Amino acid sequence: MSAPLYVINVCDHETSAERVFGMLIERHNSFEDYPIDNDAFVNSLIVNGFRYTHVDDAVVCEYCGVVIKNWRENDVVEFVHATLSPYCVYANKIAQNEQFAEDISTDAVVVSPGKPRCVYNRLAHPSARRATFDHWPAALNALTHDIAEAGMFHTMLGDETACFFCDCRVRDWLPGDDPWQRHALANPQCYFVVCVKGDGFCNSERRAETAPGEPAPAFAGSEALECKVCLERQRDAVLLPCRHFCVCMQCYFALDGKCPTCRQDVADFIKIFVT
């Protein structure tokens, strides 16, 4: 197999350059006995974050964990990856500037769904994001709390902010801006926005109809649903597999991988909409 066209890592800013290139080489080496003998296609799989699973023609994304099989040599890997794993930060970064043909198709299918990972783990908690606003424009100080709650931090470039999870950038803020709306418009596929605000938050018609971005109405006993971690927001995430209902989605993203109630490893969550 010829050497693949290596590209720089497009999303994981907390991994060293040496490790990034090491990952590329490891992915390349995994394809030695791949059943599709087409160097250009295999190179595209490698560049798009995939390694061979050694089961049929199935490959797994190193960034979101999705496993995809039933490839064709003429598949546009960028399209397949972004379509079958729409919240993968790596896939979206690569595909965002692509112009895909309207009649593009694929026979590829998902064997196992992935789980996206964030770009800036150290900024997963709102308090860590709030701490980045020391040099934020004074005229926009009133926005900083809500911007941090919406998953963004100050990049120290003017009024530019970036999402800790998807790394999308938002700038040119106005005092009356809604940070959640600005974030969702910048990247409708941001996994963090979808998890916290609900699927379809960017759809203005649906937002007007169901108002998923509105805070849940208060009701008697709401204090009992207070997040056990931040003691501020309402709980809205059931942790799996332990099924403890103890945290809000904001704090879920900042967990150390264990349930704060029982310390069991957390594999996933169920989003709860409290009304």
Swiss-Prot record:
The keyword Repressor does not apply. It holds the Pfam family BIR. Coiled coil: none annotated. The keyword rRNA-binding does not apply. InterPro entries: BIR_rpt, IAP, Znf_RING, Znf_RING/FYVE/PHD. Zn(2+) binds at residues 163, 166, 183, 190. CDD domains: BIR (cd00022), mRING-HC-C3HC5_CGRF1-like (cd16649). BIR repeats lie at residues 24-91, 126-193. It comes from the Viruses. One of its GO terms (molecular function) is zinc ion binding. Acts by blocking cellular apoptosis rather than by preventing viral stimulation of apoptosis. This is Apoptosis inhibitor 1. It comes from Orgyia pseudotsugata multicapsid polyhedrosis virus (OpMNPV). The gene is IAP1.
